[in-house]
Regions:
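Bacterial N-terminal signal peptides that target proteins for export
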Residues: 1-9
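C-terminal motif of bacterial Sec signal peptides marking the signal peptidase cleavage site
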Residues: 17-20
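Hydrophobic helical h-region of N-terminal Sec-dependent signal peptides
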Residues: 10-15
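Low-complexity, acidic/polar, glycine-enriched regions of mature
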Residues: 22-155
């Protein structure tokens, strides 16, 4: 089963990343909610990370880019066909761009990963923060809500 909420998660993920570039203004405080807990009746499923890909899109005034990122691990808890809880660990080193080629592709990926010397903090700084995490806090009207942790900051 493919989860639509992974697309929603990535949109939130890219939004957080897009605004993390050297912003000196005070960061907005977003309340962190308790992660959903599965009931005793729920069945835990492990995400097939080889078959799972998160698609991302990032935009700026001069254009946009899109690509993929992989999961390191993940679990989903179902009870009578309904998702009750879930947690996903995202492999930040796996972020790739799919709309550029050659040097431009390599430069953008290095910029996003934070592997450019002197610009490690611009986006994801994968050397210091190799993973991100999404924990579900609930589902309302088929929209998954959750806490996204990137670079040890949870929103």
């Amino acid at each position: 089963m493919k989860f639509t909420f992974l697309k929603l998660t990535m949109m939130a993920f890219i939004t957080v990343g897009a605004f993390s570039c050297k912003n000196t203004e005070k960061e907005a405080e977003t309340p962190v909610e308790e992660a959903s807990e599965a009931t005793e009746m729920a069945t835990e499923y492990t995400v097939d990370t080889d078959a799972s890909t998160i698609m991302w899109e990032g935009a700026k005034p001069t254009g946009k880019h899109h690509g993929t990122i992989k999961l390191s691990s993940g679990t989903v808890h179902l009870n009578n066909g309904n998702v009750e809880a879930g947690e996903f660990v995202i492999d930040m080193n796996s972020i790739t761009d799919e709309d550029l080629e050659g040097d431009d592709k390599a430069k953008l990926e290095a910029h996003l990963k934070g592997t450019v010397e002197g610009k490690e903090g611009d986006f994801f700084n994968v050397k210091e923060y190799p993973t991100a995490k999404f924990e579900m806090t609930g589902i309302e009207n088929n929209v998954v809500k959750g806490n996204l942790t990137i670079k040890d900051k949870t929103n």
